[in-house]
């Protein structure tokens, strides 16, 4: 078979390409598959930094998340920087882009998943919640956070306590803290 490759494809490896290339089939996951059992989900709304999305997928594999659900305006998961930052997790973590993010949140809730929004206005700290049951964490845009509509859909707004003058954490870091607290609770 002959393949025509884009010039930008080489940007995946900046300096020392290994001369290896692979052709893989794009995943076709469904939200309903991710809702089975006792799901631990990450719901990503309008994230724009490919490194953040890749880090979330990589962390998700390490934490054993059931899936990553993304809004249509989230950065392309097949962006070379995203792929590179997943360190291969893109091939092992279920993910799906949904056309109607609000409806996806509703579907999660109807399936018995409690949806938590990482939010600066959260009254509760993340440590005071029970994540041993079906759980999803909403993670918003790096600069703007979650949209008002999605924030209102959340079952509970939670926050990570901050010291000093820091207002918030990087989206991938915040997601990691929340997800690993859920993992800790599920393994006690």
Where are these regions (language model features)?
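General small-molecule cofactor/ligand-binding pocket signal
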Residues: 1, 96, 158
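Single conserved hydrophobic/aromatic residue that forms the stacking wall/gate
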Residues: 1-13
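Conserved Rossmann-like nucleotide-binding pocket used by diverse enzymes
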Residues: 5, 43, 116, 158, ...
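RNA substrate-binding interface of SAM-dependent RNA methyltransferases
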Residues: 29-122
